[in-house]
């Protein structure tokens, strides 16, 4: 179990309270698909992913990005129980979807970039360190069923 100090929890919740889940989720997933194009193979039913413009404008990318970031919000609500929060999602991604668990880490790092771009004033190095810890814990929880 991961320990979160009161300051860490406050930094997480203060940034999260400002996040537009639809906008940031769409941007994070689009960036993942553009920067790491091999991740597109998990989204072959999304239609046109042939260029950055196509990916950014793809409504299925937007919708799934919102879904992913909404799910990430569950970690924010359950900081002391992240592993159990993602148990079913880990099983789904491992046993049914066969997603490489490294992709969770990549998406977490992309989320850090998106948050830093959107909240430049609030996203101090200390805040970044806390969010890096959070995305690492979430990635580990999502990869749990792979072990």
From Swiss-Prot:
Query: For this protein, what is any one GO molecular function term?
Result: metal ion binding
Give the Pfam families listed for this entry. Answer: Globin
What the entry lists under InterPro entries is as follows: Globin, Globin-like_sf, Globin/Proto, Hemoglobin_b, Hemoglobin_oxygen_transport
An example GO BP is:
hydrogen peroxide catabolic process
- Gene Ontology CC entries for this record: haptoglobin-hemoglobin complex; hemoglobin complex
Domain Globin positions: 3-147
What top-level branch of life does the organism fall under? Eukaryota
The protein's matches in Gene3D superfamilies, at most eight in alphabetical order, are given as: Globins
Q: Which residues bind heme b?
A: 64, 93
Which keywords fit this entry according to its UniProt record? Heme, Iron, Metal-binding, Oxygen transport, Transport
Q: Give the protein's function.
A: The rho chain is the major early embryonic beta-type hemoglobin chain.
Name the family. Belongs to the globin family.
**Descriptive protein name:** Hemoglobin subunit rho
Tell me what organism the protein belongs to. Gallus gallus (Chicken)
């Amino acid at each position: 179990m991961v320990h979160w100090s009161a300051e860490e929890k406050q930094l997480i919740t203060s940034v999260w309270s400002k996040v537009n889940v639809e906008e940031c989720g769409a941007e994070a997933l689009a960036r993942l698909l553009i920067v790491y194009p091999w991740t597109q193979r998990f989204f072959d039913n999304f239609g046109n992913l042939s260029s950055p413009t196509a990916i950014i404008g793809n409504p299925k990318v937007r919708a799934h990005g919102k879904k992913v970031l909404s799910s990430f919000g569950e970690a924010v609500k359950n900081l002391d129980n992240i592993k159990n929060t993602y148990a079913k999602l880990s099983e789904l991604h491992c046993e049914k979807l066969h997603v490489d668990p490294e992709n969770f880490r990549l998406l977490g790092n992309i989320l850090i970039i998106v948050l830093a771009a959107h909240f430049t004033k609030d996203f101090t190095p200390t805040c970044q360190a806390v969010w890096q810890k959070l995305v690492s814990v979430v990635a580990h929880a999502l990869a749990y069923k792979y072990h």
